[in-house]
């Protein structure tokens, strides 16, 4: 993704643009400094998240012990910065605690080998061993009365367990945001545990909170993957576009400065430096509030809130109105006689300014689409500025963007029409079939997970007004496809997936969309056991029952990748009828024993 190097100078061209927010005096004790800055409550939470994200299998009690040891050290260092171990880096402090665990080798295997390395290589090694799909049971929410009793009995331990359980399942969860969600969780419990019907109060509120927190986790995973796989500049390019859309009245200098500082914040959190990340995030929010008159009047609604809510509020702000009377982009970037001169003298700055100007005028475009346009503009200038008549060569460059714009617009139109025709569940099934045919080598659980997530784009985005659909759809799909890429990178099985995931961050979605059925795939043998069901399926919650049916659908496609939609629809219909019949029978198991083999035979006959 070489094109994103054009952002480099943009964030380096003047130290004035990055002065102020993160310029701190050197501290004798880093841990004392961070403890003082973030406060004891947030310090304890961030240390717990740090250990939970590194050591995903350890019991909570073991983490609580480590957190106490680190907190006691921090307090000792606040009292006397010259005390023993107070001059250690935070990586040294956390890494030494991890490496001192007697059970490290037995529980984590190769992670123990990291302890033979010195910092910073040791921390990089720990990061490499974070598991995006840990072998942990699904998080089960207790009954309302049990939940409220645990909350009232020991509030501190209750929220410690919450941070621990979420962090170890999501090792890249944006730590300051996880503290925010814990705060929201507390507010819900405080209200609902006093209600007459606790369950009726808790369930919808906790469902909504869980949904938002899962999206937040996936968004941060994309940021971290972007930084880890494509470098800081890839994230800076993304942030430049998004902030230019959100704050179109802010000037280029302000946007550049915020981008630089925001990149530092996310790089720290992605690198496991959660105390620094939370501290710097608070400083950035403070800076933006101090300069709200030049950035956005919308900031006013956020800036009087406590720090966790303030930063969350700023992140969630809607786009400002585009300023009236902006000149056409073509004036500076096509018609100006010095386009090539400006480009060649300061390529990064000039192209960064182009992205800023184009993005602030197009809140109706997705971030990745705008980055594709930046890529196309750069390629045109690179070619044309080497010719005898550059202007004649690049005069139509903005018109040449149209196919790049039309492609995602058509994708959104077609898929939203399909969603409206099929509804949630059947739309997911259509995507299941589509993606199983594209990349049948991917494991069935991953295909089910990803296709269900892709299918949610319908309910999430298709009901939006036309102007909001494209950014909603494409930016959501970027997050979901990143999950596929992250899981596939650990256990690669498909060259097509590797290619789409590795070549270009902004072209991932078009790459996957362009994939046709894999004609090289050797179909799986028919396994009757895969399609054999028992009475226990009848007692499963509706969501889990749907997942069982979708798992069977993926296996059908892997067995018969050339099956028509009508054939698959027939088999799925027969399967649904079997469930309805046997789950209504008096002797459910006997029904499945008799009717199940009939389904297997009829399915084989239907599919040929």
Curated annotation (Swiss-Prot):
Record-annotated Albumin domain positions: 19-210, 211-403, 404-601
Modified-residue entries (Phosphothreonine), positions: 107, 444, 446, 570
Residues reported in the UniProt entry to bind Ca(2+) 1: 30, 268, 273, 276
Residues with N6-succinyllysine modification: 229, 460, 588
Residue numbers of N6-methyllysine PTMs: 558
Annotated InterPro entries: ALB/AFP/VDB, Serum_albumin-like, Serum_albumin/AFP/Afamin, Serum_albumin_CS, Serum_albumin_N
Keywords linked to the UniProt accession: Calcium, Cleavage on pair of basic residues, Copper, Disulfide bond, Lipid-binding, Metal-binding, Methylation, Phosphoprotein, Repeat, Secreted, Signal, Zinc
Database matches in CDD domains: ALBUMIN
Positions contributing to Ca(2+) 2 binding: 37, 279, 283
GO function term, MF aspect, one: toxic substance binding
Tissue-specific expression: Plasma.
Main location: secreted
Positions contributing to Zn(2+) binding: 91, 271, 273
Disulfide bond annotation, renumbered to this chain: 77-86, 99-115, 114-125, 148-193, 192-201, 224-270, 269-277, 289-303, 302-313, 340-385, 384-393, 416-462, 461-472, 485-501, 500-511, 538-583, 582-591
Top-rank lineage group of the source organism: Eukaryota
Modified sites of kind Phosphoserine: 29, 82, 89, 297, 443, 513
Quaternary state and interactors: Interacts with FCGRT; this interaction regulates ALB homeostasis. Interacts with TASOR. In plasma, occurs in a covalently-linked complex with chromophore-bound alpha-1-microglobulin; this interaction does not prevent fatty acid binding to ALB.
Function, in words: Binds water, Ca(2+), Na(+), K(+), fatty acids, hormones, bilirubin and drugs. Its main function is the regulation of the colloidal osmotic pressure of blood. Major zinc transporter in plasma, typically binds about 80% of all plasma zinc. Major calcium and magnesium transporter in plasma, binds approximately 45% of circulating calcium and magnesium in plasma. Potentially has more than two calcium-binding sites and might additionally bind calcium in a non-specific manner.
Protein name: Albumin
Origin species: Oryctolagus cuniculus (Rabbit)
């Amino acid at each position: 993704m070489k094109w994103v190097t054009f952002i480099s100078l943009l964030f380096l061209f003047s130290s004035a643009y990055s002065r102020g927010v993160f310029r701190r005096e050197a501290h004798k004790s880093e841990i004392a400094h961070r403890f003082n800055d973030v406060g004891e409550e947030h310090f304890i939470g961030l240390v717990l998240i740090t250990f939970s994200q590194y050591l995903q299998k350890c019991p909570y009690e073991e983490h609580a012990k480590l957190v106490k040891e680190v907190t006691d050290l921090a307090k000792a260092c606040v009292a006397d910065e010259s005390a023993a171990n107070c001059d250690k880096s935070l990586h040294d402090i956390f890494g030494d605690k991890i490496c001192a665990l007697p059970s490290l080798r037995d529980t984590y295997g190769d992670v123990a080998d990291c302890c033979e390395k010195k910092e910073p290589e040791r921390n990089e090694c720990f990061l490499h061993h974070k598991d995006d799909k840990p072998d942990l049971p699904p998080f089960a929410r207790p009954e309302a009365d049990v939940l409220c009793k645990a909350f009232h009995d020991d509030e501190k331990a209750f929220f410690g367990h919450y941070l621990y359980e979420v962090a170890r399942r999501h090792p890249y969860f944006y730590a300051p945001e996880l503290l925010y969600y814990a705060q929201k969780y507390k507010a819900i419990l405080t209200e609902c545990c006093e209600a007459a019907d606790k369950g009726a109060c808790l369930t919808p509120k906790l469902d909504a909170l869980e949904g938002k927190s899962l999206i937040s986790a996936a968004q941060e995973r994309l940021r971290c993957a972007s930084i880890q796989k494509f470098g800081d500049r890839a994230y800076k390019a993304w942030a430049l576009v998004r902030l230019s859309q959100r704050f179109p009245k802010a000037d280029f200098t302000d946007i550049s400065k915020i981008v630089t500082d925001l990149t530092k914040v996310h790089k720290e959190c992605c690198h496991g430096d959660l105390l620094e990340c939370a501290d710097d995030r608070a400083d950035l929010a403070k800076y933006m509030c101090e300069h709200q008159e030049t950035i956005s009047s919308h900031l006013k609604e956020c800036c009087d809130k406590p720090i966790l809510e303030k930063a969350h509020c700023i992140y969630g702000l809607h786009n400002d109105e585009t300023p009236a009377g902006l000149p056409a982009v073509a004036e500076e970037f096509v018609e100006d006689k010095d386009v090539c001169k400006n480009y060649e003298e300061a390529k990064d700055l000039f192209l960064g300014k182009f992205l800023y100007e184009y993005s602030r005028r197009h809140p109706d475009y997705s971030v990745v689409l705008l980055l594709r346009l930046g890529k196309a503009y750069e390629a045109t200038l690179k070619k044309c500025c080497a010719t005898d008549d550059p202007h004649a060569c690049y005069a139509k460059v903005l018109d040449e963007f149209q196919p790049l714009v039309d492609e995602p617009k058509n994708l959104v139109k077609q898929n939203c029409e399909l969603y409206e025709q099929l509804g949630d569940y059947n739309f997911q099934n259509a995507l299941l079939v589509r993606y199983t045919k594209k990349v049948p080598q991917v494991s069935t659980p991953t295909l089910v997970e990803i296709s269900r997530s892709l299918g949610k784009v319908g309910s999430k985005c298709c009901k939006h007004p036309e102007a909001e659909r494209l950014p909603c759809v494409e930016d959501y799909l970027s997050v979901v496809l990143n999950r596929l890429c992250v899981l596939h990178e650990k256990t690669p099985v498909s060259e097509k997936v590797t290619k789409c995931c590795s070549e270009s961050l902004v072209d991932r979605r078009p790459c996957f969309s362009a994939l046709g059925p894999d004609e090289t795939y050797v179909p799986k043998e028919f396994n009757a056991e895969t399609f054999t069901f028992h009475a226990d399926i009848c007692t499963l919650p509706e969501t889990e029952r749907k997942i069982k049916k979708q798992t069977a659908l993926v296996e059908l496609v892997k067995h018969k990748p050339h099956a028509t939609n009508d054939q698959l629809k027939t088999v799925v219909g027969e399967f649904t009828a079997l469930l309805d019949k046997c789950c209504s029978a008096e002797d459910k198991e006997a029904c499945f024993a008799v009717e199940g083999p009939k389904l297997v035979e009829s399915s084989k006959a239907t599919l040929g």
